[in-house]
Amino acid sequence: MIDDQRRGARPGAMLITGAGRGIGAATALAAARSGHDLVLNYSRDGQAVRGVAESIRAMGRKAHIIQADVGQAGDVQRMFNEIENEVGALYALVNNAGITGPIGPFMDTADATIEQVFRVNVLGAMQCAREALANFGRHGTRGVIVNISSIAARTGSPGEYVHYAASKAALEAFTLGLAKEVAAEGIRVCGLAPGSTLTGIHAAAGEPDRPARIAPKIPLGRLAEPAEIAEAIVWLTSPSASYITGTTLACAGGL
């Protein structure tokens, strides 16, 4: 059994990329409610992430904000340098930042879109994971990495964003391989694959009405709320999930 002390907050902070809105913001708030300090990464919307930070601080937890585009290697390095200098130890990384590009058939998808999606969703997550592992090593932390995938990795999303689905499938393969590589160090690497969730990602992809269109195809008959996904992510970082690694958990309403 897991005792109450192990269920509590752990030393070090949780870094969430793309923490200003949607699943990232909901995860930050859920983690704060569980007693954790946060490092909140954002790329563009500083006002949104400052609002999340204010809510976290109102709960009595720390929130450190860092602007960085995880699709740029230099930004990732700068972010982790700042974490080392200003925050110190991490105990968890949530690789949440991700983009889809416009919705449409693969043949209509520009090369630049495909490259940018892979740069953020795959290379950015890999670089953040590598820097987080270095932080764990410096501080002697048996940390946790949670990579946010998508149910699209398993459905393929034909006619919508095959390139995005492929990027998330790559992320799931990375999750499995890295988990096996670092398991002997007591470090866990997990994934979570949300289904369609009520966030701004649909409008950003050019189809704000997509939630209403796809809800009937989901066995539970509705899209997820960001808070539902967030609770699963925070659970994966907790001692309650201490024997789970290398697995990507589907949280997709039955898809």
Residue ranges and their predicted role:
Residues 91, 107-126, 146, 171, ...:
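Catalytic Tyr-X3-Lys loop
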Residues 126, 222-251:
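C-terminal substrate-recognition "lid" of short-chain dehydrogenase/reductases
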Residues 20-22:
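Conserved glycine-rich cofactor-binding loop
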Residues 183, 188, 244-246:
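Short, small/polar-rich loop/turn modules that mediate ligand/substrate recognition or access, typified
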Residues 77, 100-115, 138, 159-163, ...:
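Conserved mid-core segment of classical short-chain dehydrogenase/reductases
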Residues 134, 176, 180-181, 242:
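Alpha-helical segment proximal to the catalytic Tyr-Lys
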Residues 150:
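Residue(s) in the substrate-gating loop at a strand-loop-helix junction
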